[in-house]
Amino acid sequence: MSRQKKVLAIVLAGGEGKRLMPLTEDRAKPAVPFAGGYRLIDFALSNLVNSGYLQIVVLTQYKSHSLDRHLSETWRLSTQLGNYVTSVPAQQRRGKDWFLGSANAIYQSMNLIDDADPDIVVVVGADHVYRMDFADMVEKHIESGAKATVAGVRQPMEMVKSFGVIETDPQDPAKITRFVEKPDTTAPLPDDPHSFLASMGNYVFDRDALVEALRTDNEKADTDHDMGGDIMPYFAERGEAVVYDFTHNDVPGSTDRDRQYWRDVGTLESYFDSHMDLIRPLPVFNLYNYDWPIYTHQIMAPPARTVRGPNGQAGVAFDSIVSPGVLITGGHVGSSVLSPKVKVEHDARVTESVLMQNVQIGAGATVHRCILDKNVVVPPGTTVGLDREQDLARGLTVTESGLTIAPKNYRFER
C-alpha cells in the first residue's frame, strides 16, 4: 500500500481589499464580516477542514488584528494530533521587505514548508464565498502527473478583465496552454461562446516544483511576485499545469441549485449581491448544509426577538437573516441581513440592506439598499439610501449602482 500524500494548506490572507473600502478601512479583506456571523476567511478554512486538511498556515499582513483575533478565537484544532491553523505575519525572513505579492509571501515563509515537509501544497485565497472539496482536486492533481493545478470556474465573457484567465489545449481540455491575469479579451469556451474559464485562486502544487518556481521568481527582476500573474504562467509555459474544472466538484449535501456556487466578493456590489443570494426564498447558496458546515465563532448573545412597539405595531422580519441578539421592536425588516446585536426600533423600515454587528436603527428611520458597518447609529427619523446627494454630503460612500455604505462607528448628525 502506497503512503498517503502529506498535504500542507497555505491560505493567502494579506489582501488589502481596496475595492471594498470603507469596509476594509480598519480590517483585512478576509476579516470582513459576512452573512451575519461569519468572516470571509471562514469559507476557505471550512472547506479545507471539511476536506480533511488540518495543517493550515494563514499568511497575514494588512491590518490583521481583527483577523488574528478571529483565528485565535475560532480555529483551534487539536495540536496533540499535529493539527493546527496558524496565523503567520510577514517576518522579513529573507530580507528587509514585507510581502511583495502573493508568491513572495510564500517564498518568505518557505520555512513553514520546510518544517511541515509536505508532498503536496494547497494554496487558497481567503476572500471568496463557496463550498469545495479540496480532496477531490488534490486527487485529480496527483492522477494528472502535473506539477501545478488551478481550479477554474466558468464566468461570462464580460467579466474577463476581472479574473485570471485559463486557456487550454482543444485536444486536451485539462492542459493549460496560457494563463494570464485580467486580459482585455480571451477566446470563449468551445462549448459555450458566452463564457471563459476563470481562475478561482485555488492551487495544488507538488512541493518541490513549487519551491523551485518560487526561487526562480524571486531571482527575476521583471515580476510582480504574484501566484496568478507569475507562478502559474511559469508552469503553463513549461507544459506542467492543468486545470481542475469546478463543475466536477461535488460536496455532501449540495443540491442542483447551489452546487458549484462561487462568488468573488472583491467589490461592494458583489459583496452586496452575495448577501442577497442568501435570502432568496430558494437561495442559490445554502448556509444550512449541515453535511458541509461553514464554521465560525459563535457570539455569546440571547436569541433574536421580535416584539410589538409602543403603538402596538408588530416587529416583522421577512426574507431575511436575523442573527442572535437582534431586537426588532415594532420595526419592519425585509430582504436584509441583520448581524448580531442589531436593534430596529418602532416604525423603522430596513429593506435590501446588510447591517453589521451592533448597528442601531432609530424609531421611524428608513434604510434602503445600504451596507452599515459595525456600531453605526441611525438616529430616529433619518433616511439613508434614498437620496444620493444627501448621502454623499454626509461623507458616505455611494456606488454607481446606488448602494450606500456607512463605515465602522459612523454617527449621523441629528
UniProtKB/Swiss-Prot annotation:
Catalytic activity: alpha-D-glucose 1-phosphate + ATP + H(+) = ADP-alpha-D-glucose + diphosphate
PROSITE patterns, per the entry: ADP_GLC_PYROPHOSPH_1, ADP_GLC_PYROPHOSPH_2, ADP_GLC_PYROPHOSPH_3
InterPro entries membership: ADP-Glc_PPase, ADP_Glu_pyroP_CS, GlgC_bac, GlmU/GlgC-like_hexapep, NTP_transferase_dom, Nucleotide-diphossugar_trans, Trimer_LpxA-like_sf
Transmembrane region(s): none
Keyword Transferase among record annotations: yes
Enzyme class, spelled out: transferase
Pfam families from the UniProt entry: Hexapep_GlmU (PF24894), NTP_transferase (PF00483)
Pathway: Glycan biosynthesis; glycogen biosynthesis
BP GO terms, sorted: glycogen biosynthetic process
Binding site for alpha-D-glucose 1-phosphate: G164, E181, K182, S199
ATP-binding found in the keyword field: yes
Molecular function (Gene Ontology), one example: glucose-1-phosphate adenylyltransferase activity
Highest rank taxon of the organism: Bacteria
E.C. number: 2.7.7.27
Function in brief: Involved in the biosynthesis of ADP-glucose, a building block required for the elongation reactions to produce glycogen. Catalyzes the reaction between ATP and alpha-D-glucose 1-phosphate (G1P) to produce pyrophosphate and ADP-Glc.
Family listed: Belongs to the bacterial/plant glucose-1-phosphate adenylyltransferase family.
Protein's UniProt name: Glucose-1-phosphate adenylyltransferase
